Amino acid sequence: MADRHNRDLDRKPAPLPEALPVPCVDSHAHLEIVTNTDAESPEVGAVLEEAASVGINRVIQVGYSAEQSEWSVRCAEKWNTKVLAAVA
């Protein structure tokens, strides 16, 4: 996707935090920015698995434009037990 919020794409990800004591939901995510891939890509699944490893078992994927909202819906369709789509 072309729109990446002017982020530094070369920066290294932060280390993972300790796992949460109970399962939680990430209430506002932009997986399209993190992965820069198609919604159905295995890279999205890898990010979801990484989140699960620290206690985030569900993600609300927020679309902020028509294109990102469509991406969010495709993502929720593909990863339906782990992702819900929302529109901001």
Question: What function would you assign to each model-found segment?
Answer:
Residues 1-88:
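Mid-domain alpha/beta scaffold segments of enzyme catalytic cores
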